[in-house]
Every structure is written in C-alpha cells, then in structure tokens.
Amino acid sequence: MKKTFVFIFVAALALCAPQLSEAQATKDAKEANKLARDGAEASKNQEWDKAIDSLRKATALDHKYATNLAAVYQQRAYAAATNQQFQDAISDYGEALKISPEDARIYEQRAAVEMKLNDMDKALADYSEAIKLKPDEVRYYAHRSYIYEVKGDIKNSMADTDKVLKLDPKNQEAISRKKRLETLQSLRATPAPPAPAASTKTSPAAAHSPHKP
C-alpha cells in the first residue's frame, strides 16, 4: 500500500511539473513585457540609466528583448557623444556590440567617435569590421580611405577609393580623393634632386663674424 501511494504521488508531481513550468514561463513573459515597456518609455524620456536597467531585467527573463537593450545603449552612446563625452560613448557602443556583434552600424558609430579622439587605428579596425558585415556599403569604404590617407597609406587609400568608385562611379568625394592620391603617388615616384655640392668658401656671414675681444 505504501509503495502504491509513493508511486501515485510521484506520478502526480510529474503531471504537475509541466503545468508549473508553463505557469512560470507565462509569468516571466508578462513581467519581461512590462519591463520592456518601462524601458521603452524611459528611453523616450531620455532616462537612459532607467531604460537600460529595465531592459537588462527584461532580457534576463526573455532574450528577445536583447535587441531593444542594444538599441538603448546606442541611443545613450549617441547622447554622450553629442555632449562631447566620447569615452562614455565608446563604452556604450562596446556594450551594444556585445549584444549585437553583427550590427555594422554600431561599428560605424563607434569609429566616428574614435575619429573625434584622433584614434585612427581603432577607427580603422571598426570600419574594417563594418565592411566585413556589409561589403557593399559605399560609406564605409569612403571613411576608411580617408583614414588611410591621413595615416599616409596611399596604396590602401587608393584601393578603397577605387572600391567607392566601383560602387558609386559619380561619387564626387572619391573622384577628388583619387586625383589627390594620384598626385601624391607621382610626387613619391619622382626622384629627389641631388643635393648641391658643399662649398669650400667661407660664407659671407662667417667672414665678417666679430672676433673675440
């Protein structure tokens, strides 16, 4: 009799478990939805910390809200950059990329801030990542060609400029850059004139220099 009771009890628990799990999932989904709405409202009011806190909690309950959280990080980063808080902006773009590493736009936005800080190497790396994700985006090649030019890398700047013109043959900025780069290439290819032979004569200034008393 005792064994029969135990069996019935275990069987009853097994039947209840899916129902309990489903009830918890429904509760979590409702809570996540509420938190996401709170986050969206806070974001609308530019209450960034509150928005991020709400969306972090929503994402912990339901991962589908992760993209919303990434978007708020982007918004806060943009606001920080607008206020010249560039390091804060870079930090928030980094958080957004942890959530959405396939979003080329975030790499582009962070690169723009890095250029404000004159950190061309990091900006170059971010534009390169953006290009991997969107290889036909003219804007990314245009910005990267500019960075290469600033760094004095004429060869790679020309390669990116040619890519821009292949995708957008009438791009005026690229046409101007190509002409400028061609001029630089020709100047580099022209050998420097020989240095004048050293004169053995004393310069006029030296000839009339005052003697020590």
Feature-to-residue mapping (PLM):
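Conserved structural position within tetratricopeptide repeats
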Residues: K57-A60, K64, G94-K98, E129-K132, ...
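Register position in tetratricopeptide repeats
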Residues: K44-N45, T82-N83, K116-L117, V150, ...
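Position-specific recognition of the canonical hydrophobic site in helix A of tetratricopeptide repeat
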Residues: A36, S43, Q74-A77, A81, ...
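Canonical tetratricopeptide repeat
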Residues: N68-Q75, Q109, H143, R177
